[in-house]
Amino acid sequence: MQLRFAVLLISLAFAFSAVPLVSQVLHVTPDADPPLAGTRSSTVPRIYHDRGIRDIDAIGNRNIGCGRGIGNWYSLERQIAMGKEYSDHVEATSKLVKDPEVSDYINAIGQNLVRNSDSLVPFTIKVIESDDINAFALPGGFFYVDSGLILAADNEAELAGVMAHEIAHVAACHVARQNTRGKMMNMASIPLMMIGGPIGYAGYEALTIVTPLTYFKFSRHFESEADFLGIQYMYKAGYDPQALTAFFEKIKSLETTKESKVVKAFRTHPQTPDRIEKTQAEINTLLPPQLEYKVDTSEFEDAKARLESLENQGRMRSQSPSRPTLRRREPSEAGQN
């Protein structure tokens, strides 16, 4: 009895000591900015950003969360290795666009955004032949853009806005920080297992349910941070940041009308009025208007035309029989030979 009581005390001490540790990983740091001008504090989610990531002039020379420490247990080398493993699977199960003009054009947009970002890793950018309106960047800078996203964008700035958002996830090491968060949750569950009994089991069961949800889906704070960094990157690269909110509105319309196209990239990026309003307020507050922005280019129109041509060719191939069509001979025809 005394031994069990001693174990209980040790477990509780470990659990309470882990609470501040986990809270530093799971919650936004207290050093936050006041609400943005133009936001309605009663309706817009209060997700503030650290002062350090608000300095646009310091892009590329500021710490936005990739430093090793309590919130990130993954080195850049480990993140690159992780991303390479995932990218091998992606390319083994996907069909890449082979058109060099399209590939080179998308790569040029992406590399320009990367140069104007906080990324500490080089990027490899490829286009996947898919109708999905999707783009995703893996840890270590392995970036894939679906052809459906290019065709869905009305101009180059909209495409650049989505790409900048995904680049921001890598620049801020969100996957590494999310995985660290999952490991911290697992560590916090150890004392609960040691306690035993109904209370300990219930607590452990709750954590095992929560952990996968936080492991595979970015938190609201990380998504907000990617929006915030993304508009900075596209702005610094010369694009009109309003194009990102315009694309958000388009995706919101597709969601409400239940269009048949699969909007995979935004199933975990709900285009709520609050999110759109908050991004717009950040643009108005943080980014001084420029005399001119890059919005559209002839290269964008050429790339869309080439992809539409490839799409039509693929549709024609799927409709054309790849082998002779056979017809069953009718009995009445048997005696005609």
Question: What role is predicted for each listed range?
Answer:
Residues 1-8:
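Bacterial N-terminal signal peptides that target proteins for export
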Residues 21-337:
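A Zn2+-metalloprotease active-site environment signal
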Residues 8-20:
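Bacterial N-terminal signal peptides
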